[in-house]
């Protein structure tokens, strides 16, 4: 932990080199997308996308699971999504699963989670797709994790304020899958119902 503390203590010196960029952030935010992904420490949205401060509104949960929409049971997840869409006017929502996901692995294997009851109960929200997930023994559990992403996309569609915007053509949903061992980002292509690598295009330089 100490290296992290030391870095945080010196971070102010780095912002001093870019005072205008950071001062602008005080004026408000207009993020390009809501990025929903797992809490896994190996998945870093700004690293994957090259996003600078202010460009991504993030929601991270164990296993990038979203709870069912329930107006009687407000959740942090629903509040974050609602704020992104209704207040910030975000027009793109990414759900990004990943390889080697502990949560999806536990679901696929049917692990005994008695010792972590909050995790056990949270994973009941996972709602796998009707076509099921495959416990094929692959340590990367890619098939299961990709199916899991699509299940969360379906769940998002059940959030009424999202459904309204989707119907009006004002919102786009993106299902992504990140391979943590290769750095490859795959995107779901509905016509083929498969995840494929993003075609290479010129990109801007990553933030320093
Ligand atoms: Zn995960």
Model-predicted segments: where are they?
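Short hydrophobic/aromatic-rich motifs at helix boundaries and adjacent loops
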Residues: 35, 52-53, 133
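Catalytic core of membrane glycerolipid acyltransferases/transacylases, capturing the structured
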Residues: 41-62
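Thiamine diphosphate
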Residues: 26-32, 40, 52
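N-terminal-biased segments
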Residues: 1, 33-37, 41-43
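Gly/Ser/Thr-rich loops at beta-strand to alpha-helix junctions
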Residues: 40-42, 98-103
């Amino acid at each position: 932990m100490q290296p992290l503390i030391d870095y945080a203590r010196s971070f102010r010196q780095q912002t001093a080199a870019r005072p205008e960029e950071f001062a602008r952030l005080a004026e408000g935010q207009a993020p390009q997308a809501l990025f929903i992904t797992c809490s896994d420490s190996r998945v870093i949205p700004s690293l994957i996308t090259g996003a600078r401060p202010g460009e991504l509104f993030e929601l991270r949960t164990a296993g990038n699971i979203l709870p069912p929409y329930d107006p009687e049971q407000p959740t942090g997840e629903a509040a974050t999504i609602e704020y992104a869409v209704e207040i910030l006017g975000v027009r793109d929502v990414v759900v990004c699963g990943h390889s080697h996901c502990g949560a999806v692995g536990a679901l696929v294997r049917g692990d005994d989670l008695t010792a972590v009851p909050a995790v056990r109960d949270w994973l009941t929200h996972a709602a796998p797709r009707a076509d099921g997930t495959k416990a094929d023994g692959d340590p990367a559990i890619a098939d299961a994790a990709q199916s899991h992403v699509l299940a969360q996309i379906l769940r998002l569609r059940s959030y009424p304020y999202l459904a309204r915007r989707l119907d009006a053509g004002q919102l786009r949903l993106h299902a992504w899958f990140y391979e943590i061992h290769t750095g490859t980002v795959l995107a779901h292509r509905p016509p083929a119902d498969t995840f494929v690598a993003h075609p290479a295009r010129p990109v801007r330089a990553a933030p320093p």
